[in-house]
């Protein structure tokens, strides 16, 4: 069976809820462009990985070991959450919204719907990026997560249960990543050692 085959479908109440959201929000000025912008930012968690990378580099330049761990966890969490959502999608194989009354406002890389990878990675990243930035707990998720979840409905590419489950899965992934800072510290130490070893093997300009 292909990983893109679809077996599950959403019920009528989910379809009605999605149509209701689009009826209220989709035609408001600026909503669709903003939703598409969020879609591109969260695609494959690339925007969140980039943000974590910038923070990690800045912490490295400052020599702040604790901050490096936090920013590394943000990147790891975003990647891990995205991967977890893909794994669940391939088990559930729910088809994306396809009712003719639903307006689809953006292309998607997959026909699979449950859970929303955007919701999963954004929730994990928001929790972990907020922690790395030193913001109050819940502050960044409160700003980032609701708009991302709503945007997936406005664009007609997910059902309400897709985004709700994705957010829950993302929170679980964030908690798993931060359970033991020592694992991340060891990974960073290994990466640093590997980098030094590689640099040590590269001949200097005078040796070439």
Predicted regions and their residues:
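N-terminal transmembrane-helix/juxtamembrane module of multi-pass inner/ER membrane proteins
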Residues: 1-47, 86-111, 207
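Membrane-helix interface segments
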Residues: 28-31, 65-70, 98-99, 133-139
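Short helix-capping/hinge motifs at transmembrane helix termini and TM-loop junctions
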Residues: 43, 59-62, 92-93, 134, ...
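Basic/polar, acidic-poor N-terminal "presequence/leader" segments
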Residues: 44-58
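Residue-level signal for the membrane-embedded core of alpha-helical transmembrane segments
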Residues: 45-49, 75, 79, 120
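Membrane-embedded catalytic cores of phosphoryl/pyrophosphoryl-handling enzymes
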Residues: 55, 99-208
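Interfacial segments of alpha-helical transmembrane regions
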Residues: 55-83
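Alpha-helical transmembrane segments in multi-pass membrane proteins
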Residues: 73-77, 81, 85, 89, ...
């Amino acid at each position: 069976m292909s990983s893109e085959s679809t077996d599950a479908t959403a019920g009528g109440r989910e379809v009605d809820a999605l149509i209701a959201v689009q009826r209220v929000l989709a035609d408001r000025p600026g909503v669709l462009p903003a939703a598409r912008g969020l879609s591109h930012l969260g695609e494959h968690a690339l925007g969140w990985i980039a943000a974590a990378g910038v923070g990690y580099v800045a912490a490295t330049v400052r020599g702040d070991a604790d901050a490096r761990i936090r920013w590394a966890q943000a990147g790891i969490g975003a990647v891990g959450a995205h991967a977890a959502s893909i794994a669940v999608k391939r088990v559930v194989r729910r088809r994306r919204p396809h009712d003719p009354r639903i307006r689809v406002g953006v292309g998607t890389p997959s026909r699979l719907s449950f859970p929303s990878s955007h919701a999963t990675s954004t929730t994990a990243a928001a929790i972990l990026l907020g922690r790395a930035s030193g913001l109050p707990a819940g502050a960044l998720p409160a700003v980032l997560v609701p708009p991302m979840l709503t945007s997936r409905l406005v664009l007609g590419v997910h059902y309400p249960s897709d985004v709700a489950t994705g957010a829950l899965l993302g929170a679980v992934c964030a908690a798993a990543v931060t359970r033991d800072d020592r694992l991340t510290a060891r990974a960073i130490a290994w990466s640093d050692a590997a980098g030094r070893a590689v640099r040590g093997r590269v001949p200097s300009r005078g040796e070439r």
